[in-house]
Amino acid sequence: MQLVERFLCEPFPPLAQRIIQEGVVVNDRILKIDHFLNHRIDTDLMSAIGVELATRLQPFAAELILTAEASGIPPALATALAARLPLVYAKKYDPDVPVPALTRHIHSPTRDRQVQLAISARFIPAGSRVAIVDDFLANGRTALALADMVYEAGATVVAAAFVVEKQFQEGRLLLQKLGVPIISLAQITRFVDGRPLIYGWPSSVPGQSDG
């Protein structure tokens, strides 16, 4: 079955509406939607997001869901529950602390420093089919680190799914180089006059259209 990008990345209406109506553009790269997505969580919306991501992931026949703490856990858990799959999340440690596990160092924008992602190798069985789920795809550092650990464990990344994607950052291009199919429920193409534009969704900015 050939999967078309439109199915994988078409806007999810309940989410797109909330972003357009309530999203706060902080600067040319930061969109705050923490009052319903990743700080205070609208559980009804998150449940719907989980069902939608699980539906789009279904053709890839994933055997487990992988994410990183902390903001990746809510959408990953909602997806895992909807898909009836186990969930594994990478824990964050001080980079100077040795951890007997699969590890990668990444820069954390929220903490503004290096952190160490760690996963117990026994939770990523060799040969398993893994789907990465996270709240945002921006620079792609977290997703790439998770993918590297999956490959080190001898498993396969079958897809990477995100609630929100910032198209104007390099995350998608980096993941595409690995050949990983990408799912996103809202692709932010740019910010205009302090408002986000979502690909394939009617704009609230006069005279502007994206897709």
Curated annotation (Swiss-Prot):
GO terms for cellular component: cytoplasm. GO terms for biological process: purine ribonucleoside salvage; xanthine metabolic process; XMP salvage. It catalyses: XMP + diphosphate = xanthine + 5-phospho-alpha-D-ribose 1-diphosphate. Pfam families: Pribosyltran. Its EC number is 2.4.2.22. InterPro entries: PRibTrfase_dom, PRTase-like, Pur/Pyrimidine_PRTase, Xanthine_PRibTrfase. Keywords: Cytoplasm, Glycosyltransferase, Purine salvage, Transferase. This is Xanthine phosphoribosyltransferase.
